[in-house]
Amino acid sequence: ALAEIPNYQKLHRATFELVPSRPSAQFSPEEVALQPKLQDVYGILQEGFPNLLDYPIWLTDVSHRCRHGMSHVLTYRNSSTLTLVFDWKDQVLVGQVATRAAQRGSGYARDFLRWTAQWLAQQGKHAVLFALDIRISFYREIGFREIASEYVLERTDVQKEEQKKGAL
Protein backbone atom coordinates (compact mmCIF):
# COMPACT_ATOMS: atom_id res chain seq x y z
CA ALA A 1 0.00 0.00 0.00
CA LEU A 2 1.10 3.58 -0.60
CA ALA A 3 1.19 4.40 3.10
CA GLU A 4 3.77 1.67 3.67
CA ILE A 5 6.48 2.95 1.33
CA PRO A 6 9.47 3.93 3.49
CA ASN A 7 10.35 7.65 3.68
CA TYR A 8 7.09 8.77 2.03
CA GLN A 9 3.82 10.06 3.37
CA LYS A 10 0.52 9.78 1.56
CA LEU A 11 -1.39 13.06 1.16
CA HIS A 12 -4.90 13.61 -0.17
CA ARG A 13 -5.15 16.41 -2.72
CA ALA A 14 -8.14 17.92 -4.51
CA THR A 15 -8.12 19.84 -7.77
CA PHE A 16 -10.32 22.93 -7.85
CA GLU A 17 -11.53 24.90 -10.83
CA LEU A 18 -11.51 28.64 -10.14
CA VAL A 19 -15.07 29.91 -10.46
CA PRO A 20 -15.37 33.68 -10.94
CA SER A 21 -17.31 35.55 -8.26
CA ARG A 22 -17.33 39.10 -7.00
CA PRO A 23 -14.89 40.09 -4.23
CA SER A 24 -16.26 41.93 -1.21
CA ALA A 25 -16.88 45.69 -1.27
CA GLN A 26 -13.66 46.16 0.74
CA PHE A 27 -11.49 44.77 -2.06
CA SER A 28 -9.25 47.35 -3.77
CA PRO A 29 -8.16 46.16 -7.23
CA GLU A 30 -5.64 49.01 -7.42
CA GLU A 31 -3.75 47.26 -4.60
CA VAL A 32 -3.05 44.21 -6.78
CA ALA A 33 0.59 44.20 -7.92
CA LEU A 34 0.99 42.40 -11.24
CA GLN A 35 4.80 42.59 -11.09
CA PRO A 36 5.76 42.63 -7.41
CA LYS A 37 9.31 42.43 -6.14
CA LEU A 38 10.10 38.73 -5.88
CA GLN A 39 11.96 39.33 -2.61
CA ASP A 40 8.68 40.59 -1.09
CA VAL A 41 6.79 37.58 -2.47
CA TYR A 42 9.33 35.23 -0.91
CA GLY A 43 8.83 36.92 2.47
CA ILE A 44 5.09 36.24 2.31
CA LEU A 45 5.62 32.64 1.16
CA GLN A 46 8.04 31.93 4.02
CA GLU A 47 5.22 32.54 6.49
CA GLY A 48 2.98 29.96 4.81
CA PHE A 49 5.42 27.35 3.53
CA PRO A 50 7.98 26.23 6.12
CA ASN A 51 9.70 23.90 3.61
CA LEU A 52 10.05 26.54 0.92
CA LEU A 53 13.23 26.24 -1.14
CA ASP A 54 16.10 28.48 -0.13
CA TYR A 55 15.80 31.95 -1.66
CA PRO A 56 18.51 31.67 -4.37
CA ILE A 57 17.04 28.42 -5.74
CA TRP A 58 13.45 29.70 -5.55
CA LEU A 59 14.41 33.01 -7.19
CA THR A 60 16.26 31.28 -10.03
CA ASP A 61 13.27 29.06 -10.79
CA VAL A 62 10.50 31.66 -10.48
CA SER A 63 12.32 34.52 -12.21
CA HIS A 64 13.25 32.23 -15.12
CA ARG A 65 9.64 31.12 -15.62
CA CYS A 66 8.38 34.73 -15.32
CA ARG A 67 10.95 36.08 -17.79
CA HIS A 68 9.88 33.47 -20.33
CA GLY A 69 6.18 34.20 -19.88
CA MET A 70 5.32 30.81 -18.38
CA SER A 71 4.53 32.11 -14.89
CA HIS A 72 3.27 35.27 -13.26
CA VAL A 73 3.43 36.31 -9.63
CA LEU A 74 0.86 38.63 -8.08
CA THR A 75 0.39 40.19 -4.66
CA TYR A 76 -2.43 42.00 -2.91
CA ARG A 77 -1.62 44.73 -0.39
CA ASN A 78 1.83 43.15 -0.08
CA SER A 79 0.14 40.71 2.30
CA SER A 80 -1.25 37.95 0.07
CA THR A 81 0.41 36.32 -2.91
CA LEU A 82 -0.32 33.73 -5.54
CA THR A 83 1.56 32.42 -8.53
CA LEU A 84 0.21 31.51 -11.91
CA VAL A 85 2.67 28.61 -11.89
CA PHE A 86 1.96 27.73 -15.50
CA ASP A 87 0.01 30.05 -17.78
CA TRP A 88 0.00 28.46 -21.20
CA LYS A 89 -2.51 28.40 -24.05
CA ASP A 90 -5.37 29.65 -21.86
CA GLN A 91 -4.74 26.96 -19.22
CA VAL A 92 -3.51 28.18 -15.82
CA LEU A 93 -2.27 26.35 -12.73
CA VAL A 94 -2.47 28.57 -9.64
CA GLY A 95 -0.16 27.80 -6.73
CA GLN A 96 1.89 29.22 -3.90
CA VAL A 97 -1.16 30.92 -2.37
CA ALA A 98 -0.19 32.51 0.94
CA THR A 99 -1.03 35.38 3.28
CA ARG A 100 1.14 36.94 5.96
CA ALA A 101 0.25 35.56 9.41
CA ALA A 102 -0.75 39.02 10.70
CA GLN A 103 -3.36 39.40 7.94
CA ARG A 104 -4.87 35.92 8.05
CA GLY A 105 -8.60 36.09 8.69
CA SER A 106 -8.83 39.53 7.06
CA GLY A 107 -10.47 38.17 3.91
CA TYR A 108 -7.54 39.34 1.74
CA ALA A 109 -6.82 35.91 0.27
CA ARG A 110 -10.50 35.15 -0.30
CA ASP A 111 -11.06 38.44 -2.17
CA PHE A 112 -7.75 38.16 -4.02
CA LEU A 113 -8.62 34.66 -5.26
CA ARG A 114 -12.11 35.73 -6.33
CA TRP A 115 -10.66 38.72 -8.18
CA THR A 116 -8.02 36.48 -9.80
CA ALA A 117 -10.70 34.02 -10.95
CA GLN A 118 -12.64 36.90 -12.57
CA TRP A 119 -9.50 38.43 -14.09
CA LEU A 120 -8.43 35.13 -15.66
CA ALA A 121 -11.95 34.36 -16.92
CA GLN A 122 -12.12 37.79 -18.59
CA GLN A 123 -9.00 36.77 -20.52
CA GLY A 124 -10.65 33.51 -21.58
CA LYS A 125 -8.41 31.39 -19.35
CA HIS A 126 -9.36 28.22 -17.48
CA ALA A 127 -7.65 28.02 -14.09
CA VAL A 128 -7.22 25.26 -11.52
CA LEU A 129 -5.35 24.84 -8.26
CA PHE A 130 -4.40 21.92 -6.02
CA ALA A 131 -5.33 21.86 -2.34
CA LEU A 132 -4.37 19.48 0.43
CA ASP A 133 -7.02 18.39 2.95
CA ILE A 134 -6.30 21.23 5.35
CA ARG A 135 -7.27 23.86 2.71
CA ILE A 136 -10.14 22.12 0.88
CA SER A 137 -12.90 23.73 2.96
CA PHE A 138 -11.44 27.20 2.30
CA TYR A 139 -11.63 26.77 -1.47
CA ARG A 140 -15.14 25.32 -1.26
CA GLU A 141 -16.27 28.35 0.80
CA ILE A 142 -14.91 30.68 -1.88
CA GLY A 143 -17.10 28.87 -4.40
CA PHE A 144 -14.42 27.07 -6.35
CA ARG A 145 -15.53 23.75 -7.84
CA GLU A 146 -13.80 20.50 -6.87
CA ILE A 147 -13.18 18.60 -10.09
CA ALA A 148 -10.78 15.82 -9.05
CA SER A 149 -9.34 14.07 -6.03
CA GLU A 150 -6.17 12.02 -5.73
CA TYR A 151 -3.43 10.86 -3.42
CA VAL A 152 0.15 12.00 -3.82
CA LEU A 153 3.34 10.89 -2.13
CA GLU A 154 5.72 13.27 -0.40
CA ARG A 155 9.22 12.35 0.68
CA THR A 156 9.85 12.72 4.38
CA ASP A 157 13.58 11.97 4.47
CA VAL A 158 14.92 15.01 2.58
CA GLN A 159 15.77 18.05 4.64
CA LYS A 160 15.29 21.49 3.12
CA GLU A 161 18.98 22.35 3.25
CA GLU A 162 19.80 19.13 1.39
CA GLN A 163 17.77 20.14 -1.65
CA LYS A 164 19.92 20.96 -4.61
CA LYS A 165 19.41 22.85 -7.83
CA GLY A 166 18.60 19.63 -9.68
CA ALA A 167 15.61 19.05 -7.39
CA LEU A 168 13.64 21.62 -9.34
Go through each PLM region and give its residues.
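Conserved acetyl-CoA-binding loop-helix of GNAT-fold acetyltransferases
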Residues: 99, 105-122, 141
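A short beta-loop-alpha structural element at the N-terminal edge
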Residues: 28-43
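Conserved GNAT acetyl-CoA-binding A-motif
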Residues: 1, 120-132
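Helix-loop element at the rim of GNAT/NAT acetyltransferase active sites that forms part
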Residues: 43-55
